[in-house]
């Protein structure tokens, strides 16, 4: 394997490792969000868009080169005179196998680049939704406690007005308290609606993350299968070559 394809294969192994690491269930999205917001990661992300575009361009060029090589060595029987070159068939099959291997490596690297970027985005969105969900819960609880407090004060004022024989202007106080209660109830209902909307968004984000995890696991299994086929084909190609050398 040449130097460039060794680098691409190493990059593919690193992508598979990072995807599996992001799919670990016991690491919460909040912890990943803290890691993503660290200084080192932010420094990398500041140059990440340029690096991502350059990486995509390189991988696309490598995919095109691999496709060109496959088409070059595809019709072996039409291009090789087997009578004059008995060993040329094996040579062309080896070239075709390497071109197909390079296409798989470059294609999976390109696909996992988009998958990894999308997975990081979904994890960040899920962490943000979880944080906003907790904030809305706390805000709703504080509003509910304030409403209960005003209702208790209202009851106390009513009792005090009854004891004083109706001398106090209870009517105005009741109107103000009722207005405050209505305002608090409206705020509480608004917070409940926002909390329900946030829960729906959170469930949607969790479903997307789960789908991405299943897709990444499927890609990993497919890549393992291709590695096994690669090993079998390499053994099949190396076997006749070793016999000829002997």
From Swiss-Prot:
InterPro entries found in the cross-reference section: BAP29/BAP31, BAP29/BAP31_N, Bap31/Bap29_C
Protein modification: Cleaved by CASP8 and other caspases.
- In Pfam terms, one family for this protein is Bap31
Location in the cell:
Endoplasmic reticulum membrane; Endoplasmic reticulum-Golgi intermediate compartment membrane
Q: Name one GO biological process term.
A: apoptotic process
Site-annotated residues for Cleavage: 164-165, 238-239
Q: What residue ranges are annotated as transmembrane?
A: 7-27, 44-64, 103-123
How does the entry describe its membrane topology?
A: Multi-pass membrane protein
Which cellular component appears as one GO term in the record?
endoplasmic reticulum membrane
Asked if Membrane is a keyword of the record, the answer is yes
Task: Give ranges for the Lumenal compartment.
Answer: 1-6, 65-102
Function, in words = Functions as a chaperone protein. Is one of the most abundant endoplasmic reticulum (ER) proteins. Plays a role in the export of secreted proteins in the ER, the recognition of abnormally folded protein and their targeting to the ER associated-degradation (ERAD). Also serves as a cargo receptor for the export of transmembrane proteins. Plays a role in the assembly of the mitochondrial membrane respiratory chain NADH dehydrogenase (Complex I) by stimulating the translocation of NDUFS4 and NDUFB11 from the cytosol to the mitochondria via interaction with TOMM40.
Record's subunit section: Homodimer and heterodimer with BCAP29. Binds CASP8 (isoform 9) as a complex containing BCAP31, BCAP29, BCL2 and/or BCL2L1. Forms a complex (via C-terminus) with TOMM40 which mediates the translocation of components of the mitochondrial membrane respiratory chain NADH dehydrogenase (Complex I) from the cytosol to the mitochondria; within the complex BCAP31 interacts directly with unprocessed and processed NDUFS4 and NDUFB11. Interacts with VDAC1. Interacts with VAMP3, VAMP1 and membrane IgD immunoglobulins. Interacts with HACD2.
The protein's name is: B-cell receptor-associated protein 31
């Amino acid at each position: 394997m040449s130097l460039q394809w060794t680098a691409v294969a190493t990059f593919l192994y690193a992508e598979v490792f990072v995807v599996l690491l992001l799919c670990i269930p016991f690491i919460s999205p909040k912890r990943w969000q803290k890691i993503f917001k660290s200084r080192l990661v932010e420094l990398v992300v500041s140059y990440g868009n340029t690096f991502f575009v350059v990486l995509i361009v390189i991988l696309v060029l490598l995919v095109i080169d691999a496709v060109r090589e496959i088409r070059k060595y595809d019709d072996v029987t039409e291009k090789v005179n087997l009578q004059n070159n008995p060993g040329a068939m094996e040579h062309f099959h080896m070239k075709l196998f390497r071109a197909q291997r390079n296409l798989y490596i470059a294609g999976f690297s390109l696909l996992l680049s988009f998958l990894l970027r999308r997975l990081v985005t979904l994890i960040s969105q899920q962490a943000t939704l979880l944080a906003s969900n907790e904030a809305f819960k706390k805000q709703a609880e504080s509003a509910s406690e304030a409403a209960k407090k005003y209702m208790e004060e209202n009851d106390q004022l009513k009792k005090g007005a009854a004891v004083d024989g109706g001398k106090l202007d209870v009517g105005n106080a009741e109107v103000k308290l009722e207005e405050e209660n209505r305002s608090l109830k409206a705020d509480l209902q608004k917070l409940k609606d926002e909390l329900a909307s946030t829960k729906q968004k959170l469930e949607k984000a969790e479903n997307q993350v789960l789908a991405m995890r299943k897709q990444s696991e499927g890609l990993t299994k497919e890549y393992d299968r291709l590695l096994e086929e690669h090993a079998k084909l390499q053994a099949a190609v190396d076997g006749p070559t070793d016999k000829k050398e002997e």
